[in-house]
Amino acid sequence: ENSNKNTMLASTQRDYIAGEVSRDLTKRMLLPEKISKAHEEGILHFHDADYFIQPIFNCCLIDIGNMLDNGTVMNGKMIESPKSFQVACTVTTQIIAAVASNQYGGQSVDMIHLGKYLRKSYNKFKKEIEEKYGDKLKSDIIEDLVQTRLKAELKAGVQTLQYQINTLMTTNGQSPFV
């Protein structure tokens, strides 16, 4: 029924059972009779009846820019604004996992907000290299060293995003749908 869910997992099976209970209660007790009847007759489709009894959301746009720029709270712990691209990518995947475990359906994340963290990494690398080699190396060599480290961090950050999103599992046994 849902290709993002592994039906062999107990958490997925529990989610499916809860969904059937929710559909039944939604049909018998929560929806007006004419809506339930129209759904049964195929006149309309009442979407997400399997989650209707719960106060959770279907799909959202995560305000990742605000959460990264101003910090956020996850699991009762304050997460400060990242100081590098790699950390921003890691925090982004943690936010995606937390949101996915507390809703159903997909989520959208605007990755453009990660750009400023690449700039932070650039500035950090440049400062480190200038402090260590500033008067011993020409500026173009310093820039080349900074770019080499920056490209490695960019690659590692994107790899983190890909691996984490593809291997994370939510509480209902589903991979985040991003």
Regions found by a protein language model. Give the residues of each.
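Catalytic alpha/beta active-site cores
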Residues: E1-V178
